[in-house]
Amino acid sequence: MAQEKRGSRDDRQNREERDSEFVDKLVAINRVAKVVKGGRRFGFAALVVVGDQKGRVGFGHGKAREVPEAIRKATESAKRDLIFVPLRDGRTLHHDVHGRHGAGKVLLRSAKAGTGIIAGGPMRAVFETLGMHDVVAKSTGSSNPYNMVRATFDALKHQVHPKDVAAQRGLKYATLQARRAASGNGSEE
């Protein structure tokens, strides 16, 4: 049986198809300097958020002497560290959640259909690439894009699907949904 060579044309086409499902957004680009004996060497640092708009999202950081190379490195880094976030009705969060990183703190709240993405700066890029359509987000503390993105990811990692909550509590999913509807936190459609 003949083995295909690594890096063959078919492999490249499959990689391009896999990569085409992702949407990437450039969040921040900074000029950075490395001090060497002869002076300063300037380069660029990029922060990129990547997602499939179906619940998977990741962020990456890349540095290089040229902007396009920094963006490429950041995009590759983001694709390696994707997380899955369960969405209610494919559009919003299941419950309100807090996240923090360093001095950056965020509060993410689920929203009614038609609300849109009410979020500032770097958080908006995360929600758009995630595929979330309705969310209200508030950031406090540090407005550094790196801290805001990491705090947003911290909050999203704490998002739990109601089926998992029901399993932990030893309840049936339908019972949990009935309680949610009775308390007024059910689907608002």
Swiss-Prot record:
With S4 and S12 plays an important role in translational accuracy. Keywords: Ribonucleoprotein, Ribosomal protein, RNA-binding, rRNA-binding. One of its GO terms (cellular component) is small ribosomal subunit. InterPro entries: Ribosomal_Su5_D2-typ_SF, Ribosomal_uS5, Ribosomal_uS5_bac-type, Ribosomal_uS5_C, Ribosomal_uS5_N, Ribosomal_uS5_N_CS, Ribsml_uS5_D2-typ_fold_subgr. This is Small ribosomal subunit protein uS5. GO terms for biological process: translation. Coiled coil: none annotated. Belongs to the universal ribosomal protein uS5 family.
